[in-house]
UniProtKB/Swiss-Prot annotation:
Belongs to the UPF0325 family. This is UPF0325 protein YE3288. The lineage of its organism: Bacteria, Pseudomonadati, Pseudomonadota, Gammaproteobacteria, Enterobacterales. It comes from Yersinia enterocolitica serotype O:8 / biotype 1B (strain NCTC 13174 / 8081). It holds the Pfam family DUF3461.
Amino acid sequence: MYDNLKSLGITQPEDVDRYSLRQEANNDILKIYFRKDKGEFFAKSVKFKYPRQRKTVVADNAGHGYKEINEINPNLRYVIDELDQLCKRDQVEVDLKRKILDDLRHLESVVTNKIAEIEADLEKLTSGR
């Protein structure tokens, strides 16, 4: 699993925290950031440069003109897919934690309101005597 990342020398893909991608001239620059260890001020990162792929395509439907376009390198596309899987997994875990906390707060509110309702009913019973 994560063969493309491992081919880049990333031996522990689970340590990837996030990544950034930018275009610089005819290259795409991929920067991968790793989780910080305790006591570190800055996250470790590695940078990779991928040349953009050049293609000549038909410029119009009549087939008279051609134009040159630049596309993302296919290898980079595979690496980004793996990075998205890793980063999305972390987001899913955070979302699940947030959902559980929201459910817990809602349950707390419901129980608090129910206790107040029962206490009010008890008060009615005791004051009615």
